[in-house]
Amino acid sequence: MNPETTRFAPSPTGYLHLGHAYSALFAHDIAQKTGGQFLLRIEDIDITRCSDAFEAAIFEDLAWLGLSWETPVMRQNSRHPAYRAALDTLEGLGVLYPCFCTRREINAEIERAASAPHSDAPHSNGLIDYPGTCRKLSDGERQTRMASGVEHAMRLDAEKAAGLVGPLEFVERERGPIAVDQNQFGDAVLARKDIGTSYHLSVTVDDADQSVTLVTRGIDLFPVTHLHRVLQALLGLDVPEYYHHPMIEDSAGVRLAKRNDALSLRHFRDQ
C-alpha cells in the first residue's frame, strides 16, 4: 500500500460540525494507515465571510478530536499569485471570457428560457446555471465594457476547453475510472468579481501544489470533480485519485450544516 497524502480543507466561516469531523477523521485515518501525510488547509479566500475566531476554533476542534497534521498550514488567502498564474495560463489558452452578468440577470435569463415555447430549461448541475450571455459578446464589446470599468467575473468556456483536452477520466476509489461529463459543470466561474479566484480554481491548484494523492470529500462535491479534472488537464497538473464519502445527516435525513449550532463540535466539547 503506497503512502497517501490526504487533506482536510475547511473554510473558517462557522464552527465545525459532525460532518466535518467525519471528513477530517476519514482523511486522517487513510494517511495514518498508509504511512502518509495528513494536511490541513484553510480555505479563506472569501474574506468577507471568514473570521480569525472561526479559524482558531478549527484548530481547537481538530486537536480535541486527537488529530495532528503537517506544518506549516496552507492558507488560501496567501496563494493569490499562484491562482493568478493559473488564470494567466487559461487566458493564454483562450478558454476564459469575462462575464458582466449579475446573479439577478442570470436568474432572469434562466426563467425566461425555461418559460419560452419549445425550449428546455438549463440543466441543473450543482453549479449555478449560466445561459452563456457573455460568451456571445464580441471581443470589441468585451473590451469596451472592461475599459469602462464594468466589474466582471471570468468564466471557463467549457466547449473550447473540451475541444482542447479531449476525453478525460478520473479514478474514484472503489468505483474505478469515471468519464468526465461536460454537462456536469458548464461555463463555471473561475475568478469571482470580488476575490479574483474561485473555489474550483483554488482547490485544484492547491491540491496539485501540495502533492495530494487522494482527495477525500463528501458525495455532494462529486459533480464538480468533472470540472476539476478539466482544469488539471488544461493546467498540466498531476491528477489525484478521489473518494467521495456519504454525507452525514440528522435524524430527519437533513444534511448537517454550519448553521445548526446544536450539532457543532464546540457544542459537544462544552457539554
Which residue stretches match the model-derived regions?
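Active-site cores that bind ATP or allylic diphosphates and position pyrophosphate for catalysis
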Residues: E105-A257, S264-F268
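C-terminal active-site "lid" helix and adjoining low-complexity regulatory extension at the edge
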Residues: Q271
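N-terminal Rossmann-like or analogous alpha/beta NTP/dinucleotide-binding catalytic cores
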Residues: M1-H118, I219-D220, V224-L237
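Short linear Ser/Thr-Pro motifs
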Residues: S11, A257-R259
